[in-house]
Amino acid sequence: MADVDKLNIDSIIQRLLEVRGSKPGKNVQLQENEIRGLCLKSREIFLSQPILLELEAPLKICGDIHGQYYDLLRLFEYGGFPPESNYLFLGDYVDRGKQSLETICLLLAYKIKYPENFFLLRGNHECASINRIYGFYDECKRRYNIKLWKTFTDCFNCLPIAAIVDEKIFCCHGGLSPDLQSMEQIRRIMRPTDVPDQGLLCDLLWSDPDKDVLGWGENDRGVSFTFGAEVVAKFLHKHDLDLICRAHQVVEDGYEFFAKRQLVTLFSAPNYCGEFDNAGAMMSVDETLMCSFQILKPAEKKKPNASRPVTPPRGIITKQAKK
């Protein structure tokens, strides 16, 4: 299509990055046909790559961004702008924050520019029924039009669902599913697809770990399930994996371990929605699969007795970098 053929990706990235150093909140108003081109071209790339990505370290893994564009720029300043580092994002790019459009446009532009070094998974907010309600639809309608929001929906319906890093680290947005017995089940999911109300795809995007649950439990979200530590241990053992890396929940320090450090939650939007005093974090995985955490501190000072950093896991050594 014409929008794709004449897409000047370098110019788009340059304009999106021009606001670095500006006061947070300054918008970048791309042309509508440029955004449409980003959606169409990235959709093509998503469909040309597997729904279950098989990735190699080294790479940096990021959790929810939720339209906090200036925090996304901070993450890149800290971790290195592509292609300096390889990246995997775990979903939830849009909704709640003020600049979902800039956020998703920069991420899609990097996907197009560096398709083998930059990866985006689907979060539960990359779904029309959710982002219709929580801000993205309204932002598209206010700044462009509803048709453009529908173009994003077509793109989101083609995002990959999960990734495995060096056959050892399983990554998805939400968590495990009682229906997940074999990785082949993920590979068999056909795209484009909406997110169903239940089942494997729904669970991978919506489920949560819960230390108080044995096996599977009801989820307070009213969608999917919660799962306990034993479910994690059994899953890792069965599939010869070391770690589950997921996002989907705000955690105070930007990262939080679960199940004897066999699962880690990453959340990359500091001061989430301006309502939380959380840090944001990014996990760096080196060639030896050593994991370390880079922290974006929240703007306000933390309370003096904030919890201590979590003890490093066995087998996967961690160190903490603060900024």
Curated annotation (Swiss-Prot):
Q: Which cofactor does it need?
A: Mn(2+)
Localization recorded for this chain is: Cytoplasm; Nucleus; Cleavage furrow; Nucleus, Nucleolus
The domain of life is Eukaryota
Q: What is its EC number?
A: 3.1.3.16
User: Is-annotated flag, keyword Transmembrane helix?
Assistant: no
Q: Which SUPFAM superfamilies match?
A: Metallo-dependent phosphatases
Q: Name one Pfam family in it.
A: Metallophos
An example GO CC term for this entry is: mitochondrion
- What catalytic reaction does the record list? O-phospho-L-seryl-[protein] + H2O = L-seryl-[protein] + phosphate; O-phospho-L-threonyl-[protein] + H2O = L-threonyl-[protein] + phosphate
Record bears the keyword Cell membrane: no
Positions bound to Mn(2+) 1: D64, H66, D92
Principal location: cytoplasm
Role according to the record: Protein phosphatase that associates with over 200 regulatory proteins to form highly specific holoenzymes which dephosphorylate hundreds of biological targets. Protein phosphatase 1 (PP1) is essential for cell division, and participates in the regulation of glycogen metabolism, muscle contractility and protein synthesis. Promotes nuclear envelope reassembly by targeting nuclear membrane vesicles to chromatin at the end of mitosis. Acts by dephosphorylating membrane proteins such as lamin B receptor (lbr) to regulate the binding of membrane proteins to chromatin.
Q: What is this protein called?
A: Serine/threonine-protein phosphatase PP1-gamma catalytic subunit B
* Gene source species: Xenopus laevis
**Gene behind this protein:** ppp1cc-b
